[in-house]
Amino acid sequence: MSIDRALNFDDLRAIAKRKLPKIVFDFVDGGVEDETCLARNRSAFQDYRLLPHYLVDVSKRDQSVSLFGRRYNSPFGISPMGLAGLAYPGVDLLLAKAAAEANVPYLMSNASNATIEAAAAVAPHNTWFQIYATTDERINIDLVRRARDLALETLVVTVDVPVNSNRERNRRNGFSRPPKMTLAVFLESLLHPRWVARFILSGGIPAMENWGVYAPPGSGRDGGGDLYGTLTPAPSMTWARLEEIRSRWSGNLVVKGILSPADAVRAVEAGANGVILSNHGGRQLDAAPSPLDVLPAVRAAIGERAEILLDSGVRRGSDILIALALGARLTLFGRPMLFGAAAGGEAGVRHALALMRREVDIVMGQIGVPELAAIGSHSLWPPGS
């Protein structure tokens, strides 16, 4: 199937599965343990129904949304993804470029394979910087400084990785972070010569570029990745440390990985301008609820004191409209963007965003919503569900 014939995210996934080595595809696609959380993220959306309202003039539809004082063209953005470069060389900057062209947010992970400085140069108004706390407070402080020096508007602190999770697909495949060229990886790669050729031409397995500046001299090509592996996760991360980050950052602060309404309230009290409801795409706790399931309770808990964003399981335009009807301002998705890149490079990334924009537009017309301000609990069946 060519990229032009991919009609939805599942089609992109199918193409990517053929083109990527199994170890890489499983790293992107997989969840934790039995992957019940991964499945729940999708079934949660399927439990809701959108209620059409007809005889509404929907000849002109506007899916733009205001968030943190900026107007974005669509109610979705690109989730942060570490080691994204394994799917396609240079994909982090392709994502930044595509986000700028589509005018949607791009959340760059500090575990990415390009620097935040490079992303900010490509997409200065669309790049948000997502960081994990480390066990080295000097690096924590410097990551915030780098975002501040670049005049980025939004800093995202991910809090749902207190310890490493039990990703059994990765363990079975011999996947490591940072990636190592093991015999199993080498043999699997032989079945995907084009994937191998891309990395040979681009200089090899991608490094964690954001961390290179912190690596000791002489520590090797991906010394930053090795250092990252020793300093993360940070099980000692607390609300006090989040407040410390807030004190060093004057821009928008968003806390990612919130599921508890009480934690959402605490985040707002700590100075957060927004929270991202997320279970890390089903990659941390297999028994965790879907972010969509907790969305109504979180909105009730924090009211309008902060913005609510949501990721984990968003695959259709109808998913986005359901989330907005329940109180989210904007949704995020990640895996489909890497599947698009693996399927078609830069064109595949653009195609993924275009697919979602088209679906949102169609669903808005179908349910009688000419602009997103018109959607609410009345757009669901049963009403208020």
Where are these regions (language model features)?
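Alpha/beta enzyme core
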Residues: 83, 97, 122, 135-310, ...
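Short, conserved beta-strand segments within well-ordered enzyme catalytic domains
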Residues: 49, 64-66, 75-79, 105-107, ...
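A gly/proline- and charged-residue-enriched helix-loop-helix capping module
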Residues: 100-122, 126-140
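A generic secondary-structure signal marking the coil-to-beta-strand transition
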Residues: 46, 68, 72-76, 125, ...
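An N-cap/entry alpha-helix motif that binds or orients negatively charged groups
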Residues: 1-70, 178-237, 373-375, 381-385
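Alpha/beta catalytic cores of nucleotide-metabolism and tRNA/nucleoside-modifying enzymes
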Residues: 1-46, 293-385
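Glycine-rich active-site/cofactor-binding loop and its immediate structural neighborhood
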Residues: 72-111
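Short, charged beta->alpha transition segments
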Residues: 60-69, 94, 107-119
